[in-house]
């Protein structure tokens, strides 16, 4: 976050005044309190639930509030295989989320269709349905990988001008 410290004109003014833009402050707050929607499609959802458990504890980063409704969430973690029958529902959930909203594609099935990519009923990547901000590769990715993806998204939200390599 870009913070500018100015020398006070009056020595009576305390030195703990920080000047910044409203957008920078809002992005800083948003990056430290993602509210993911509870949404798992396959095996990767088990690893996503494990990341919320006591061993990995994503609560220490402020991301523990899994919301039951997309209208209360700002992050969708697509964890697992997206089928053609499920694709319109994924799109609808994304559209119901309030802005600003972000998407993490978790696992090789969500990223590219995984081992089922040649199937007639599997979508070859969730990025064909909704815009994806961060990709977390693996089959199934470990909870540490999801935490790494959340931290990468945090950097992207704090400084939106920096493009991350997908």
UniProtKB/Swiss-Prot annotation:
PANTHER family reported for this sequence: NADH DEHYDROGENASE, NADH DEHYDROGENASE [UBIQUINONE] IRON-SULFUR PROTEIN 7, MITOCHONDRIAL
Name of protein: NADH-quinone oxidoreductase subunit B
Cofactor binding description: Binds 1 [4Fe-4S] cluster.
Similarity-based family: Belongs to the complex I 20 kDa subunit family.
Assembly mode: NDH-1 is composed of 14 different subunits. Subunits NuoB, C, D, E, F, and G constitute the peripheral sector of the complex.
UniProt binding sites for [4Fe-4S] cluster: 43-44, 109, 139
HAMAP family listed in its UniProt record: NDH1_NuoB
Gene name as annotated: nuoB
Gene Ontology MF annotations: 4 iron, 4 sulfur cluster binding; iron ion binding; NADH dehydrogenase (ubiquinone) activity; NADH:ubiquinone reductase (non-electrogenic) activity; quinone binding
EC number: 7.1.1.-
Membrane topology (UniProt): Peripheral membrane protein
Role noted for this protein: NDH-1 shuttles electrons from NADH, via FMN and iron-sulfur (Fe-S) centers, to quinones in the respiratory chain. The immediate electron acceptor for the enzyme in this species is believed to be a menaquinone. Couples the redox reaction to proton translocation (for every two electrons transferred, four hydrogen ions are translocated across the cytoplasmic membrane), and thus conserves the redox energy in a proton gradient.
Catalytic activity: a quinone + NADH + 5 H(+)(in) = a quinol + NAD(+) + 4 H(+)(out)
One Pfam entry name: Oxidored_q6
Keyword field contains Glycoprotein: no
GO cellular component, one term: plasma membrane
Keywords: 4Fe-4S, Cell membrane, Iron, Iron-sulfur, Membrane, Metal-binding, NAD, Quinone, Translocase, Transport
GO process terms (BP): aerobic respiration; electron transport coupled proton transport
